[in-house]
Every structure is written in C-alpha cells, then in structure tokens.
Design a protein with these regions (language model features):
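Conserved alpha/beta enzyme-core scaffold
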Residues: 1-465
Length: 465
C-alpha cells in the first residue's frame, strides 16, 4: 500500500470500512463518490466488511500493515502448497482441522488413502496430524499408543485418527510476505511483544520472491486471489503513463522500488488490478501545478499497463479502454482549475471531439468542495491529519508547518522580498521553544541570526503559533 500520508490514508479508510461500515458508506455518499464512481467502486473494490480478511504482500512490512493486523483485517492466511491453498479458496476445507479435512485431501488426491511416508510428513508439516504420529513397522503409531493400519479407508484407522491423531488448526500459514520491516517504535514494540509463533505469520523473503512471479505461478495465483496492488505516483499523463521515480530533466526523486513489478503482476494474475494513487496537484516554485498532465518527458509505468487511477476527487478505471475513454476518465478526477487546459490539449491532439464537454458532475473538483463533504466527519474526529498518531513533539509540528510556509514563500521573488522584510522583526517570545528545538534560540553568528529571524516570522505568519 505504499508509505507516507497516502499509504496511511488507504489503511485508515480500510479500517473505517471494516469497523464502521455505515460511516464509511456515508462518507462516500457525502463526498459524491458513490454517485459519480459507484460502478467502479463496487466492481473493483466493494463496499462490505472484510469477513474473510486480507493477505498482504509488500516489499516493506511497516506500521500500516501492523494496524490492519491488530484490527482483525489482515487475517487471511496463505500456504505454500497449491493443492491445500486451492481447497481453502474453494471452501473444501477450513483452517480448523477435522475429519472432513482428511476426507477432502484424499478426495482431491493430495494424499492417498494408504499413507505413504510423504503423505504423513505433509500432514504433520501443515499441522493436520499431531506431530507425534509416525509410521512404525508398517503401522501408524498414534499419541495415545494405539497402532493402526495406515489406511484412511479402514474405519478403525479413521476413528482412531479423529480421536487422538488430528491437529487443531492448519499450521505454517502466512499473513504477510515481505522483504524487510521498517517502522516506528510502536511497530517494533508490537513485534517484540509477540510470541515466536505469532511472528512467524510475517514471512520475510527475498525481494525477488515478493516482487516477481518466478517459481510457481499456480500457487501465486491461488495466494493472490482478487489481488489489489496499490502504489503511489507523482504524475499521470492523460494517456495513462505514470511518473513515479524521476523528473523530466533527469533528476531522480526516488527509487522505483517494486512498483513496476507489482503493476506487471496485476496484469499477469487473474482478477488482479493495479491501483495508482496520486494527489491531483502540487506546488512548484510557489505555483500550483496539476499532477495530471497531457504529456511528460519521463515514464515509470507505460501506458499499455494503465489500470485504475485514484486522486482525491475520484477513481478512473482505465484498463482495456480506448485513448478517448482514458482521457475522459482522467479529466473526471483532475482538479477543476486545470481541466480546461487539459481538455484543450486533448482536443488539439484530436484525441477528443471538438464538442466534448466534461460532465457537470465532475466540474467541481476543488479542495473547498471536498472539504465541505468531509467537514461533518472531521468535526467528529474522523479523517484526522495523523490517523495513527505520530512521534513529533508539539514544537516539531509547529516547525513543520512553518518550514513548509518558508519553503513556499522563498520560491518566488515577491515571497523572498517579504522574507527580507521579516529580518527587521525580532522573533515573538512564543517562538522560543521552537527556536530552541532548532538550536537557534541563541544565534552564534550572522547566518544563525538570519535563520532565527526567518523561522520566527514563519512561525507567526503561517499560523503555527
């Protein structure tokens, strides 16, 4: 699901959907999401709670997945045996072991009626039989000392196995496959407090194992049933190319990670979908710019792998669509302040007819409209800025706001002139704790004196104090 604020938002919404489904649906209605995107929401994501639970595969196991585990959403265990996994998927067996487990395994020819040594090891390996069951002199020795024929068709054997030879629950199931774990102190404490048996639910594998369909495609398909691969990107062209790792001038912003691999997996696995999330706008050099663009001189995910795209304004289902349909869908989730120029670019390229008009329901994609829809929920302490808490001090939160303000101001000439005027003002006394945190409360030289004045002014002018 990615890391950062978009990843946290995804985890939070997933929890809300499960824990307070009525509130979740109401939020979708109040923001207009159901009216405008109800079909794709229902067919790609659904609206119900997670009765069977989720399984996760991710390069990084961190706070988000741990929250899903602790709230009972991450609970679908997968197994590294295709036959066993298939029976679980079909409902032929459950994770609770009983007489029907043996019957189903035999009927599916995963084991034979007459136990071979391999059958016995398989049954013990996955916790179906008690670990003390073993073959001895051609007989099946059970924990209570009974010795029976190793044949499920023998009524006495079957009865004896059911009485003392069965395990209680399938073993060696996995909830998360990941390559490494990284998170907050809360996350590490949660791992540390777990017994070893519980930690084994989180399996660390090679990156290649997590990110690729290498060894056993049939097993991967069974484990990744109805998979949804969520990733974050920076920009999206109107033809469906995603920009995630580099800028058009060659500057590398971040490593591509497993994003391309997961998108490719979404197209290779049956019933799987790739979902790319991005903010519709960003600020650059003090100017607001659209993250949905007509074209861009770099691409991380090519247009032929386009699938589902999500912005704060809605969902665009692009898979299998024509260029015209793709452009129209992406215009519907773009910020309305940039829709006219994007629409004009598409028309100039003759990708949309000259008389095409963005539907009225999608022409009010503004922060104000979105905030109005969410306002009743924010007033009820839903959708908080930090849904899972934080490790910042109050001063660090104030400084975060002030420094962002300072960065935005310094991006333009007018802003720089305003900051220069701020040098004439001494920092307000309320800024002292923040300046102490920055080591600027007692400037030692001219540079620190300037920094202290700028930070003090930013704290006041940004409303952080």
């Amino acid at each position: 699901v990615g890391i950062g604020s978009l990843g946290d938002a995804c985890i939070y919404a997933t929890q809300l959907r499960h824990a307070d489904n009525g509130c979740y649906r109401e939020a979708l209605e109040r923001t207009g999401a159901l009216a405008r995107f109800g079909l794709v929401i229902e067919t790609v994501g659904g609206l119900g709670t997670y009765a069977q639970g989720l399984y996760a595969g991710s390069e990084m196991f961190g706070d988000g997945l741990m929250h899903l585990y602790q709230t009972g959403i991450l609970k679908r265990r997968v197994y590294d045996h295709a036959g066993l996994q298939a029976l679980l998927n079909e409902g032929g067996i459950s994770e609770s072991v009983g007489p029907e487990t043996l019957t189903a395994l035999r009927d599916a020819h995963i084991i034979e009626a007459k136990f071979s040594p391999e059958d016995l090891e398989f049954l013990k390996h996955y916790g179906i039989l008690h670990p003390d069951v073993h073959l001895d002199g051609g007989r099946l020795a059970l924990p209570d000392g009974a010795r029976v024929a190793p044949d499920l068709d023998d009524a006495a054997t079957f009865k004896a196995l059911v009485k003392t030879g069965l395990g209680e629950r399938l073993g060696r199931g996995v909830l998360v496959h990941a390559a490494f774990f990284l998170g907050s102190q809360w996350f590490y404490d949660a791992l540390h407090k777990m017994p070893e048996s519980e930690r084994r639910l989180f399996a660390m594998e090679a990156v290649s194992t997590v990110n690729e369909l290498f060894s056993d495609l049939a097993l991967e398909q069974l484990q990744h049933r109805h998979a949804r691969f969520l990733n974050i990107c920076m920009k999206m062209t109107l033809l469906g190319s995603a920009v995630s790792d580099s800028l058009d001038d060659g500057r590398v912003v971040s490593g591509v990670g497993g994003q391309y691999n997961f998108v490719a997996m979404a197209h290779a696995l049956k019933q799987a979908r790739s979902i790319l999330m991005l903010r519709s706008t960003h600020k650059s050099h003090g100017r607001l710019e659209s993250n949905i663009v007509w074209e861009y001189a770099h691409s991380t995910i090519p247009r032929h792998l386009r699938d589902v795209v999500v912005t704060e304004y809605g969902v665009a289902d692009l898979r299998g669509k024509s260029d015209r349909e793709v452009i129209a869908a992406l215009l519907n989730v773009a910020d309305s302040r940039f829709q006219p120029e994007l629409l004009a670019a598409a028309k100039r390229a003759r990708k949309l007819p000259a008389d095409y008009v963005i539907p009225a329901a999608h022409r009010e994609n503004t922060p104000e409209q979105l905030a109005a829809g969410l306002a009743p929920f924010r007033q009820s302490d839903l959708f908080p800025d930090f849904p899972f808490g934080h490790e910042f001090t109050p001063e660090e939160l104030q400084l975060g706001r002030a420094l962002k303000y300072l960065q935005a101001k310094s991006a333009s000439l007018a802003g720089k002139l305003g900051l220069a005027a701020a040098l004439l003002r001494a920092p307000p006394s309320a800024a002292t704790p923040c300046l102490q945190r920055m080591g600027l409360a007692k400037p030692k030289n001219l540079v620190e004196w300037i920094y202290a004045r700028l930070v003090g002014a930013a704290l006041k002018d940004s409303g952080a104090l």
